[in-house]
Amino acid sequence: MGSWTKRPPPETLARIREIISANADGAIEAHDLRTRHAGRMMFIDFHLVVPSSMSVAAAHQICDRLELAIKAEFPDALISIHVEPDDQAKHSGRKVHGEEKDAAVAGLEVPTP
């Protein structure tokens, strides 16, 4: 299927997970990480669960922080973050704060057909 379906190496995925974990303070959970390459561009998207009481502005600040951190290491990345309020989210159980933070994104990647 050409370069659109090319997955990044496992160490790249691990690094993206680490960046998300280190920069998602204020969020509850991250899940459904998907990555693909098309030429030099890497497309990264994932879902970020935030407290339902969080303002749009606060959620946007978290997303900005995540995008800047990811782009610092992957400047050719196009990043899409789908924000979900926790009372409507499809929870994965992968928390991104407290003691569970490191494990939160360990299984973030979801294979895509």
Regions found by a protein language model. Give the residues of each.
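Alpha-helical transmembrane segments and adjacent TM-loop junctions that form the membrane-embedded core
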Residues: 1-113
